[in-house]
Amino acid sequence: HSSQASVIIDQHGQRLVVPFHDPHVSQDSGWLPIDQLKHAGMLHCDVRWVEGARHALTAARALGTPTMVDGDVAPLHILQQLMPLADYAVFSDAGLLAYTGLQDVKEALMQVAQQHKAQSRHVGASCGAEGYWWVEDGQLQHVPAPQVQVVDTLAAGDVFHGAFALALLEGKPVRQAAQFACVAASLKCTRFGGRLGCPTRAEVEAYLQAS
């Protein structure tokens, strides 16, 4: 069986995900249609299926297709395998701290940016209501998240990654892409549901124009 999860949402809109990953599912990644990556604008992977992600990321790099990895909380050995394969290493704040063993997001970002300077063109961390931090030309940069009434944070990180990748592929500079992604993720948090709560592009652009 593929992975399943129960999601518990409290009265403040914060979510707890309780996942189940079937240990009997084959980890073989040989069936992946790797040749299709040459037509992709970007490959985005998370840390849930390390064999598949490693295979696809390695192939994408060989083909010259940009890669992005969602550096969420995972066993350290998994993060150590996947994050160096990311052109865009986009951590969650908790994932970044788990990867570095540090307690401060800004310090951790600077450390990873230095360590990955030969592998990654971008290192950043999404920090929920605190917005998005990244390192550019050796300096910390920040985009705040809009302050919203939170109903449900489920899938906010996924929305951020998708919107960020889209904006980058459309040629937006990182700051503008991060603003677009922060607004998209924040609007998602005002609605119940994961996929059902995703905002439309028109809604995100209308918010940006009004702010």
Where are these regions (language model features)?
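Residue-level detector of anion-binding/catalytic polar loops
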Residues: 14, 66, 88, 140, ...
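Short alpha-helical
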Residues: 1, 24, 51-52, 74-77, ...
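Acidic, amphipathic alpha-helical patches
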Residues: 33, 79, 150
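Conserved phosphate-binding/catalytic region of the ribokinase-like
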Residues: 76, 105-211
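Conserved beta-alpha-beta core of the PfkB/ribokinase-like small-molecule kinase fold
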Residues: 41-110, 131-132
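Active-site donor-binding loop signature of nucleotide-sugar glycosyltransferases
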Residues: 20-22, 91, 145, 200-201
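Conserved N-terminal subdomain of the carbohydrate kinase-like
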Residues: 1-41, 204-211
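Structured loop/turn residues at beta-strand edges in well-structured enzyme cores
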Residues: 35-38, 84, 118
